[in-house]
Amino acid sequence: MPKIIEAVYENGVFKPLQKVDLKEGEKIRLRIEEGIADVIKEFSRKVDQDVLEEFLRERR
């Protein structure tokens, strides 16, 4: 069953931010997705500041 696990990429290695139930040396597939903060940063250059602030208020 697929699981979503957040990880940080440091020095060429993906480091999970939570405990994972894997055996040493087990191979897995990774699907890399941008986080919402990364998406907002990308579009903030294209969106009026007032519109961005309204969007962030609605997301809370």
Swiss-Prot record:
The keyword Isomerase does not apply. InterPro entries: AF2212-like (IPR008203), AF2212-like_dom_sf (IPR024069). Gene3D superfamilies: AF2212/PG0164-like (4.10.1150.10). Signal peptide: none annotated. The keyword Transcription does not apply. Keywords: Toxin-antitoxin system. Possibly the antitoxin component of a type II toxin-antitoxin (TA) system. Belongs to the UPF0165 family. This is Putative antitoxin AF_1087. It comes from Archaeoglobus fulgidus (strain ATCC 49558 / DSM 4304 / JCM 9628 / NBRC 100126 / VC-16).
